[in-house]
Amino acid sequence: NSWLRARWFANDAADRITRVMEGAAATDPMIAQVKMSEAMADLMIGMTFCESPLVASGPTATDTQNLEQAVANFGEAIAAAKAANNSEFELASVAGLAQAHLLLGNYAAAAAEAAKVPAGFSYDAVFNEEDRNWVVLVTTKGFNEAAGLMYKWWPKIDRTTTQSSYMRDPLTDEPDPRMPVYFDGEVATDNETPHYSQYKYALENADIPMLHSDGMRLIEAEAKYRTGDYAGMTTILNTLRAAVGLTAFATPTDDATAQSYLLNERFAEHFMEGRRRNDLHRFGLMKSVFAALNGGAGDSERPASGRPTKFSMSDSEPTYNPNINNDLTQRCLPKT
């Protein structure tokens, strides 16, 4: 898949830069960039897949092993960025390290790294007219409109004919500026399903944040939650809410409510950034969330039981990798 290729290219680029620049490579920002990119590929692989090789043509490794490799590689990237005096790649690597620790369950370490990332920082996936944003092209009003927001969220979206609106906050019913949406009654490309469009990214060259400071504050909040410090969690989350004009919520007194508040805020802050599925996997909520569809009746097209919570590796990897047995029965596939 593309992340395996990205990892290989980053590793190969580091070798070539070192070979050509020799001693000067150690303080060149390009080394920091490619080392960060290699670690970022490890992070995305570990977040998305239940297994993947750690190196090109290597044997299968677990998602945990890929995330542990991300931790090590982000450490190297941070050192390289410091040597190059490049704050952008250093902060992106620190943020990536915080995310990797979070996914590994190292909550104190995750919070410690996240705290180093200042407000306003964002490291984005960059798109342009040649490399277009397919989230926009497939899901967005005015483009293909082949996909849209699930019907679970429709009651929280107001119809409009003149401008985009915001999905309403589940706690206060206030429009949440972190979740721009668009629905004017138009149906999608199947000529049947109402097209509820995301509108956070409205242009085909819109960039998507991969790591950002608000996400780091969410990591700090989750670390508080994991230790039962609901008041500390609430303070962080309400600060994020205040920044967009939303009413604060009271400190929860039980775990279920605290978890719900945390995940609501993660959904809003990371809206359309590709984090929700992994959150449901991490918290063991995939089954209950899908069972609750249609007022608790479930959805035959989106079953709650036997539903994969992570992807197995791409079909092409075991086909062409001599160190992986090309046998579907040996692939991991965690399910509800």
What is the predicted role of each segment?
Residues T162, D173, P177-M179, T253-T336:
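Long, intrinsically disordered, low-complexity segments
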Residues L67, G105, A109-D214, Q259, ...:
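Hydrophobic-face positions in mid-chain alpha helices that act as interaction patches
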Residues I17, M21, F49, F74, ...:
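Alpha-helical junction/boundary sensor with strong preference for TPR arrays
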Residues A41, T48, A98-A100, A223:
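Residue-level signature for tetratricopeptide repeat
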Residues M44-L54, N85, L103-N106, G228-D229:
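Short coil/turn linking the two alpha-helices of tandem helical-hairpin repeats
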Residues N1-T48, E76-A84, E204-L211, T239:
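Conserved, well-structured interaction surfaces
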